[in-house]
Amino acid sequence: MVLEKIIKMVAEQFMIDENEITADTSFMDDLGADSLDVVELTMALEETFSLPDTPEDELTNIHTVGDLADYVSRATQE
């Protein structure tokens, strides 16, 4: 469920088809994102999932869509 929502948001932000995105999709290598893109997406997810502010050390560990889904899943359980 979390992964599907994130895939939809990533597809909207990067204007690509949802079917082109998997958990293994790399923000930088596959989508051409930079760190600011990841921060913007994370901020949108914080709002969508009512998450606290994402610590900077967590952001440095988010490289793929799956990494982001794992973080959101952990954060929503806390």
Describe these PLM feature segments.
Residues M1-A33, T42-M43, E47-E78:
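Phosphopantetheine-dependent thiolation modules in NRPS/PKS and related acyl-activating systems
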